[in-house]
Amino acid sequence: MKRIILASVAALGLALAACGQQQQAPTSGEESSGVTAPTINTNIGPDGAAGISTALSMDLMSVRAAAPLYDVALVEDQIEGQTFTAITLSTGGQEVFRLLPNADGRHVHAIVTNSVRAKGPTQESVSSARFAVAPPEQVEFCLSEFVDGAAGFACSTAEDGNFWRVYMVPEGYDGPSDPFDAIDPDVLHDSVLVEMRWIAPRI
């Protein structure tokens, strides 16, 4: 009798185990839900921005093909009173990058960002990173530059560098800001990153 009971218990255990395995087996729908969605490229550095690394044609079709996960749109822009058409890359209703045209307006000259979503070469972001933590070899050459009417400066590896970090000096600073070397060293260290800029290769 004991053998019969033990055999029945063993058979029941095997049946329950098989049932458990069937319940744990994922359905085709569950398998597809585990697929990782593509990640939007928010990086900018010497090699490009948003996955763009060439002087693309300044048209929506070309830019959409190069940055398919972004919402791409034409916008009117101006620099020093001169108007031109730029292209924006946005996600979630917020602009992340802006593509600026070259002199003839046919190709991308630069891609700039002042979005906190964009990440620089060391994963730094606008409004939080300071000049003091920038890699020295990446900011060897600096020039004074006004930022929204305030004193600031832009730095790269050299005068012809293709990636620039733009900083604004702390609010309230009333000392000299031009040339760059005239800015107080302590002020430089506390200056905040406000823009990153990639320059496209010349056509």
What is the predicted function of each stretch?
Residues 11-12:
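Repetitive helical segments and hydrophobic/amphipathic motifs
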